[in-house]
Amino acid sequence: VLQKAEGDLFGKIYEYFLNKFAMTGAQEGGEFFTPMSLVQTIVNVIEPDHGIVFDPACGSAGMFVQTGYFIESEGLKPAEKVTFYGQEKAELNTKLAKMNLTVHGLEGKIFEGNTFYEDKHNLVGSADFVMANPPFNVDGVDKAKDVEKKDTRVILDGKEKKKKNDN
């Protein structure tokens, strides 16, 4: 059967097992992957069809895979239209993201690192699309290491801008 597989069959199989992993193993560690229906909604609303697409909490790269499907549905090739950049805190998820892109025939620059503390891609002001479902359940954020302290977008004349945090 696998010798006669066509199209994105391996990608679909990988997504199936990734979803099973997300529903069991990942949640035990307090990590949750964004539901596919939400990912599809985000992609359909912002229509990321060109340039740099960045996900600062990319998990298993589901946003990128759905973006690839979106671009292909327009009759275009994702590799010719977009460049994916992702950052993921957990080492295992970083590996899952890279593998997910590979089995779907996509390429991207995925780095391991905590976005709260460091911007591995240095894309401030450069990304055409930023898609994320940030990890609201993050524990132990070290304020002293927070990248925000060095981010010129939130510092004004040596004083931090007052921010409103009303999710």
Label the model's feature ranges.
Residues 1-2, 125-129, 163:
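Short, mixed-charge, low-aromatic patches
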Residues 3-7, 28-36, 159-166:
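Short acidic-aromatic active-site loops that bind/stabilize oxyanions
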